[in-house]
């Protein structure tokens, strides 16, 4: 049996530490995305692939990239689902939860099945999206960096990024909810439809 020295284990311990810290970093107030505009992204609705990709202008959006394979993502998702349920009747808000595979382009059928199975097993009522060819992540990475799961962008009604959360911390749900509610003040309430 080989004797493993501490010096030989340093690179492994360093990598494990980086991965662990990525999973618990929380809101990033200096993220390069803050203040930048997010254009349309080539996303596919898992429930209806013919549905148009979400538009960000005019709404407050939480754009979340997560994966069923990612433990911090699985811990964060129930909080996002609770927030989306709480604001379900407010047309000024949308949660765009993008389910991502473990690496490379995602097979749409596989990601749809895996995501549906996960959401059902967790009893999460969530409208999930996919980035099957990885283009949305490529666009975001080229524009202002993307590299950890989960990553959540808070996008204002002017389609600019207002906050970014990378990784997961238990208080993120409350922080995200407060940020969303505050940002909703920038979007006029829509009048209910008139009776005919």
What are these regions (language model features)?
Residues 59-61, 66-69, 148:
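Short pre-active-site segment immediately N-terminal to redox-active cysteine/selenocysteine motifs
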Residues 22-40, 117, 193-196:
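N-proximal helix/coil linker or "cap" segments that precede and/or mark the start of modular domains
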Residues 40-61, 84:
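A short beta-strand-turn-helix
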Residues 113-151:
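Short, internal strand/loop/helix patches
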Residues 151-196:
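Thiol-/selenol-based redox modules, centered on thioredoxin-like
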Residues 65-82, 107:
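Conserved redox-active cysteine motifs that mediate thiol-disulfide chemistry
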Residues 91-109, 124-134:
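Thiol-based oxidoreductase modules, predominantly thioredoxin-like and allied folds used
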Residues 59, 75-99, 120, 173:
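Conserved helix-turn-beta segment immediately C-terminal to the redox Cys motif
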